[in-house]
C-alpha cells in the first residue's frame, strides 16, 4: 500500500526526521491561507499514491499568491497516472544546496533489507541505476542485526558527506530503518534528501507498507480503502484476492499459482490480463457469481477467461455461478472456460447448455480468449 506523501511525512516527523513546514489543502482557494502561514515561495505537490509526480506535472513552485492560486486550480483539475488530485501538500520552499537519495527496500533475491544511497538525488532510482549504476551505494542489512551506526556513517562518507552533515545522515538513516521495521514497510524513501541552510531535510518522503501487515496498523486502514477502486472494494468484501491491471482479458482462477499461470499463458499468446482474481478454494456458486460480476462491471474487460482446477472446489458450483451471473446481468461479455476436477462432467454439462465455450487445455482456452479480445 502506497501512503500519500503527507501521511508518510507525518510518520517521519513523529520519528524526528526534518521535513519542510507544510499545509494540506483540499480546495484551490485554501492555498491563500497556506501561503499566509508559510510565506513565499511555496511548493504545491499533488497527493497521489504513485511515484514520478514531478515528471507528470504534479509538483509546482509558486512565487506569489496569484501564481499559487492559479497553480492550485491547475493541479486540482489534473489526473496523474490515473489518479485524480483530491488534495495538495503546500510546503515552504527550502534553499536547496544539493539533492541526495536515501532509501530502504527489500532485496528479494538475497532475502535481506538493502540500504540505497546516492549523491545524485531527485532522479527516480530506476533511471539512476540504468544511467549511472556506480552512483548508487548499496548496503545489505541483516534483519536480525539491523543497521549499525558505523555502517550508516560509511555510506554517508561514500556519497561525499562529512562533519555535521555526516552525523545527521547517520541519525536519519537509522531512523528511516526503524520506520521500515516498525511499519512492516516494503519501501521507505527520501528523494530528495536535500542539503539546505538548516542541514539535511527530507523534501520528499515515500512509504509502501506490506498489504498483508495492515492488520497490525489499524491507523492505516483508511489509507488502504482510499487506494482501492470501487471494484477492488467489492471484491474485498467477498474476500477475493483481486488486483486490477492494464489489459482487457479478465482472469478468474482458484489458487494464486493457477491464476498467475493463467495470466502467463495469456501473455504468452499475445494477450493482456485485465486483472488477477483468485476466488480461493471451495468457492460456492454465489462467490463465483460475484467474481464474474466484478469483471462484467470492469469496462476494460472485453472477454472473461475462467480457469478452474477443482479439488475442494466443485466444477458444478463454478459453472452454475457463471450462468447465474450472465443470466442476471445486463452486461454481456464473451466467456471462455476451462474447468477440470471434482464434479467436472456436471459442470461441463451446465456450461454447454448455456452455450459457453469449453476447452480441455489452458493453452487452447487462452488462445481463444486472446482471439476474442482482439476481435472485440
UniProtKB/Swiss-Prot annotation:
Metal-binding keyword on record: yes
A GO BP entry: tricarboxylic acid cycle
Catalysed reactions, as listed in the record: succinate + ATP + CoA = succinyl-CoA + ADP + phosphate; GTP + succinate + CoA = succinyl-CoA + GDP + phosphate
Domain ATP-grasp positions: 9-234
The family this protein is said to belong to: Belongs to the succinate/malate CoA ligase beta subunit family.
SUBUNIT field: Heterotetramer of two alpha and two beta subunits.
Pfam family membership, one: ATP-grasp_2
Binding site for ATP: 45, 52-54, 91, 94, 99
Function comment: Succinyl-CoA synthetase functions in the citric acid cycle (TCA), coupling the hydrolysis of succinyl-CoA to the synthesis of either ATP or GTP and thus represents the only step of substrate-level phosphorylation in the TCA. The beta subunit provides nucleotide specificity of the enzyme and binds the substrate succinate, while the binding sites for coenzyme A and phosphate are found in the alpha subunit.
Class of this enzyme: ligase
Keyword Cell division: no
Pathway: Carbohydrate metabolism; tricarboxylic acid cycle; succinate from succinyl-CoA (ligase route): step 1/1
Organism this protein belongs to: Ignicoccus hospitalis (strain KIN4/I / DSM 18386 / JCM 14125)
Cofactor: record remark: Binds 1 Mg(2+) ion per subunit.
Record-listed substrate binding positions: 254, 311-313
Protein name according to UniProt: Succinate--CoA ligase [ADP-forming] subunit beta
GO cellular component: succinate-CoA ligase complex
Enzyme Commission number(s): 6.2.1.5
Entries under HAMAP family matching the protein: Succ_CoA_beta
Cofactor or coenzyme needed: Mg(2+)
Source taxon at top rank: Archaea
GO molecular function annotations of the record: ATP binding; magnesium ion binding; succinate-CoA ligase (ADP-forming) activity; succinate-CoA ligase (GDP-forming) activity
Binding-site positions, Mg(2+): 191, 204
Keywords: ATP-binding, Ligase, Magnesium, Metal-binding, Nucleotide-binding, Tricarboxylic acid cycle
